[in-house]
Amino acid sequence: MAGYKPVSIQTYPVLGEKITQDTLYWNNYKTPVQIKEFGAVSKVDFSPQPPYNYAVTASSRIHIYGRYSQEPIKTFSRFKDTAYCATFRQDGRLLVAGSEDGGVQLFDISGRAPLRQFEGHTKAVHSVDFTADKYHVVSGADDYTVKLWDIPNSKEILTFKEHSDYVRCGCASKLNTDLFVTGSYDHTVKMFDARTNQSVISVEHGQPVESVLLFPSGGLLVSAGGRYVKVWDMLKGGQLLVSLKNHHKTVTCLCLSSSGQRLLSGSLDRKVKVYSTTSYKVVHSFDYTASILSLALAHEDETIVVGMTNGILSVKHRKSEAKKDSVPRRRRPAYRTFIKGKNYMKQQDDILINRPSKKHLELYDRDLKNFRISKALDRVLEPTCTIKTPEVTVSIIKELNRRGVLANALAGRDEKEISRVLNFLIRNLSQPRFAPVLINAAEIIIDIYLPVIGQSPVVDKKFLILQGLVEKEIDYQRELLETLGMMDMLFATMTRKESTSVLQHNTSDGFLENNKIES
C-alpha cells in the first residue's frame, strides 16, 4: 500500500509595505526601555553637548538622565507646583524651566539650587528658551504675555502683549539674537524682534497652537495645533508652504532630526510621524501605548525619547553595528572526518539497512489520511488558520473537491459551523488567487442549504452579504470588460490609421515613379 502524500499548500508572495531607506533607518532601534515618572511627561530636551544627557520635566520635578542610564543622575525639585519646559542652553551648562506659579528658574547643571529666579508672570509659564547669545531668556505664559529676561542682571528687558490667549510654546532663533517665535491658543504664531519691540510676522494657524519649531537656518517655521502641522516660509513674510494632516488627534510636539532632513511630530493618537523635509510626505511611523506629549532626538539620532500622558518615558537606542571579528568562526572538521570510510571494502555478506525518514503530518493531513473529511475541514476553518494562513484553508477545500467529497464535508452543519464557512467565503471570495476554488465551494453550499434558507436569521444575513459581494464583483467585471472594449477600439483605430498612411505613402511613390518613367 502506497504511503499517504500530504496536501500541497500553495504559497503566495506576501504583499507587505515597500522597504525604503527610511524604513531601514528608523527601524534600526533596540527594544524601548520604559521609565516610570511621577506624572505626565510634558517636555524632553537633550543637551547639545556631550555626553548628551537629557532633561525630563514631569510633575514638580526635573530629572537629568544619562544617555544610557535608567535612573536619574540629578534631580531639580525646587518647585512649589508643577514644572514645565526644562530646556538646555547651547553649551549644555545651564538649564531654564517655567512653573505653575509663574516663575522662571535658571539652574546650573552641576548644582541643585537655582542660580536665577525671574518673577514677572502672573500665571503658569509653559514656554522658555535661550536666545542665540546665551545671555537672555524668552518666556511665554498663560497671562498672554511674552517676556525677554537678562540673565546677568536678573531683570526683565521687554514685555510683549500681542497674544489674546495662553502662550503655550515658543523657540528662539539659532542665528539671530533678537528673533524668537511664540505660539498661542489664540490660533496665531508670531515672530518677535527685540529691536522693534513688536512682532514682525504673524501667521494664522487655524487651531490652538501646541508646538512651534524654527529650522536652524531660520527660513522655515513649523507650527502644530489641532490635527494639522503647517510649514511657513519666513523669508516670504510667513507664506504657507504646506499643511499636513496625517494625525487623527491633536499634535502636541515637534522635533527635527540631526541632519535636518526629517521632521517628527507626536500626537495624542499615540503615533510619531516622520516626514521628509523636501516632499513633506510621511516616510515612517512609530506606535506607542499612550498619548504622546513630548519628543526629543539625541545627537546623530542615536536615541529617541518619547514622553506620554501616563507618565511613561519610552527610550529607544540605535542598534550598534556588529563587528565581523566579534563573531566566532566555526571550527572546521578535522582531516580524518573527510577520509572516514574511504578505505572500507564491501563484503559479500554485508546487509544494507535504509532508515526511513519520519514524516511529520499536520493535523488536517492526519484527518484526511483517516478519511475524516469533516474534521479536516473544521480544523482549517478555525480563526487562527483562516486569518493568518487562508491559503491552507483554500488548499484543503481544493483537495476535498478533487476527491469529490467536498459536498459531504459541507453538509449536515449547524448554524454556527455554516456561519464560519460563509465568513471565510465573504472575506476571501473577491481575492483573485482564491476565487476559482471558493466560487465552486459557494455554489455547492447554495445547492445544499437552499431548502433551509429562511430558517436562521444569522445564516440568512450571511447569504445576503455574499449575494451583495457577488453582485459587486459582477459589476467590477462588467466595467473591466467595457474598459477592455474601449481600449480594443482605440488600438484598432490607431492600427487602421497607420496602415492607411502607409498605403497612401506607397501609392504616392508609385505615382511619382510612373511619371518619371513616362517622361
Curated annotation (Swiss-Prot):
Part of the small subunit (SSU) processome, composed of more than 70 proteins and the RNA chaperone small nucleolar RNA (snoRNA) U3. May be a component of the proposed t-UTP subcomplex of the ribosomal small subunit (SSU) processome containing at least UTP4, WDR43, HEATR1, UTP15, WDR75. Interacts directly with UTP4 and WDR43. The modification N-acetylalanine is found at A2. WD repeats lie at residues 36-75, 78-117, 120-159, 162-202, 204-242, 246-285, 287-326. The keyword Transit peptide does not apply. Its main location: nucleus. GO terms for biological process: positive regulation of rRNA processing; positive regulation of transcription by RNA polymerase I; ribosomal small subunit biogenesis; rRNA processing. There is a cross-link at K249 (Glycyl lysine isopeptide (Lys-Gly) (interchain with G-Cter in SUMO2)). Pfam families: UTP15_C, WD40. GO terms for cellular component: endoplasmic reticulum; fibrillar center; nucleolus; small-subunit processome. It is found in: Nucleus, Nucleolus. SMART domains: WD40. Keywords: Acetylation, Isopeptide bond, Nucleus, Repeat, Ribosome biogenesis, rRNA processing, Transcription, Transcription regulation, Ubl conjugation, WD repeat. This is U3 small nucleolar RNA-associated protein 15 homolog. Ribosome biogenesis factor. Involved in nucleolar processing of pre-18S ribosomal RNA. Required for optimal pre-ribosomal RNA transcription by RNA polymerase I. Part of the small subunit (SSU) processome, first precursor of the small eukaryotic ribosomal subunit. During the assembly of the SSU processome in the nucleolus, many ribosome biogenesis factors, an RNA chaperone and ribosomal proteins associate with the nascent pre-rRNA and work in concert to generate RNA folding, modifications, rearrangements and cleavage as well as targeted degradation of pre-ribosomal RNA by the RNA exosome. The lineage of its organism: Eukaryota, Metazoa, Chordata, Craniata, Vertebrata. The keyword Thylakoid does not apply. It comes from the Eukaryota.
